């Protein structure tokens, strides 16, 4: 029991936990960049908080009305005016430069991805199409992914987060995800992967990811698309050497039965 608890405490956090205040563990370079940017900005915020708090406390302590019944009137100070103009201008620059760099890297499109998956949102399930396995227009590797009802959950599965068919992808491989809806606006968002792509009716949006470690990653629709709008997304990253057999054993029989 102790070993099991130790494993749970050191295992990567790839799904939301009760009372969780921080980020989920990063599984892609994009998510790691988001976390690093957050920490860098938070560092500047702490410095500003300490500096402003010190000035405020010092002013309240030294310029109390009991110590200075007649306050000194200062109507102009060139030095302080220059400093309070320059420093607030420099700080946003330090924040903006890495922010724009991360933003452009997240919006980058792969010219030749190793694999393409199409995610089609419905009310309230998803259809996934592995475009690279399409042999013809009539026959394609396509399957539906539904939320597992709480009464059908097995031991170890998360309520409101588990699906019957997961999206299986190879780890450490450049992937392209094409997102589109079949009815109303949806969204394809997985926090551990650092992706959130809106599905707009009549449009095809795409994102590029590269999952750096094996694991199961949970997400949910982040658009209010109806009663069950938070229907989940489950991405399972497997080793590249096992990916072919995993797809042929799990996904292809399911599509054949459908």
UniProtKB/Swiss-Prot annotation:
Would you identify the family this protein belongs to, as annotated? Belongs to the cytochrome c oxidase subunit 2 family.
- Cofactor info, note text: Binds a dinuclear copper A center per subunit.
User: What intrachain disulfides are recorded?
Assistant: none
- Originating organism: Pisum sativum (Garden pea)
Q: InterPro entries attached here?
A: CcO_II, CcO_II-like_C, CcO_II_C, Cupredoxin, Cyt_c_oxidase_su2_TM_dom, Cyt_c_oxidase_su2_TM_sf
Catalysed reactions listed for this entry: 4 Fe(II)-[cytochrome c] + O2 + 8 H(+)(in) = 4 Fe(III)-[cytochrome c] + 2 H2O + 4 H(+)(out)
- Note the topology in the membrane: Multi-pass membrane protein
Keywords (alphabetical) are: Copper, Electron transport, Magnesium, Membrane, Metal-binding, Mitochondrion, Mitochondrion inner membrane, Respiratory chain, Translocase, Transmembrane, Transmembrane helix, Transport
Superkingdom, natural source = Eukaryota
Localization per record:
Mitochondrion inner membrane
A single MF term (Gene Ontology): cytochrome-c oxidase activity
Quaternary state and interactors? Component of the cytochrome c oxidase (complex IV, CIV), a multisubunit enzyme composed of a catalytic core of 3 subunits and several supernumerary subunits. The complex exists as a monomer or a dimer and forms supercomplexes (SCs) in the inner mitochondrial membrane with ubiquinol-cytochrome c oxidoreductase (cytochrome b-c1 complex, complex III, CIII).
Q: Which residues lie on this side of the membrane: Mitochondrial matrix?
A: 62-85
Query: One cellular component GO annotation, for this chain's record?
Result: mitochondrial inner membrane
Required cofactor names: Cu cation
The UniProt entry lists the main location of this chain as: mitochondrion
Annotated residues that bind Cu cation A1 are located at 186, 221, 225
What EC number(s) is this enzyme filed under?
Answer: 7.1.1.9
Q: What is this protein called?
A: Cytochrome c oxidase subunit 2
Q: Name one GO biological process term.
A: ATP synthesis coupled electron transport
Which spans are transmembrane here? Answer: 40-61, 86-106
């Amino acid at each position: 029991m102790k070993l099991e608890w130790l494993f749970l405490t050191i295992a990567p956090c790839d799904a939301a936990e009760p009372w969780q205040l921080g980020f989920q563990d990063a599984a892609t370079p994009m998510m790691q960049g988001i976390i690093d940017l957050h920490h860098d900005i938070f560092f500047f915020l702490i410095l500003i908080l300490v500096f402003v708090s010190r000035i405020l406390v010092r002013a309240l302590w030294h310029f109390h009305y009991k110590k200075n019944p007649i306050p000194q009137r200062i109507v102009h100070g060139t030095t302080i005016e220059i400093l309070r103009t320059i420093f607030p201008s420099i700080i946003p620059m330090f924040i903006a430069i890495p922010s724009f760099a991360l933003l452009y890297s997240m919006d980058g499109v792969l010219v030749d991805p190793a694999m393409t998956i199409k995610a089609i949102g419905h009310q309230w399930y998803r259809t996934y199409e592995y475009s690279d396995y399409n042999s013809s227009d009539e026959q394609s590797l396509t399957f539906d992914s539904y939320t597992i009802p709480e009464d059908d959950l097995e031991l170890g599965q998360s309520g409101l987060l588990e699906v019957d068919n997961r999206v299986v992808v190879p780890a450490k491989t450049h992937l392209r995800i094409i997102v589109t809806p079949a009815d109303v606006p949806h969204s394809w968002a997985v926090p551990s992967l650092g992706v959130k792509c809106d599905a707009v009716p009549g449009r095809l949006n795409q994102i590029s990811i590269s999952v750096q470690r094996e694991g199961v990653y949970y997400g949910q629709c982040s658009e209010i698309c109806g009663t069950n709008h938070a229907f989940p997304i489950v991405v399972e990253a497997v080793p590249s050497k096992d990916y072919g057999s995993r797809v042929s054993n799990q996904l292809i029989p399911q599509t054949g039965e459908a």
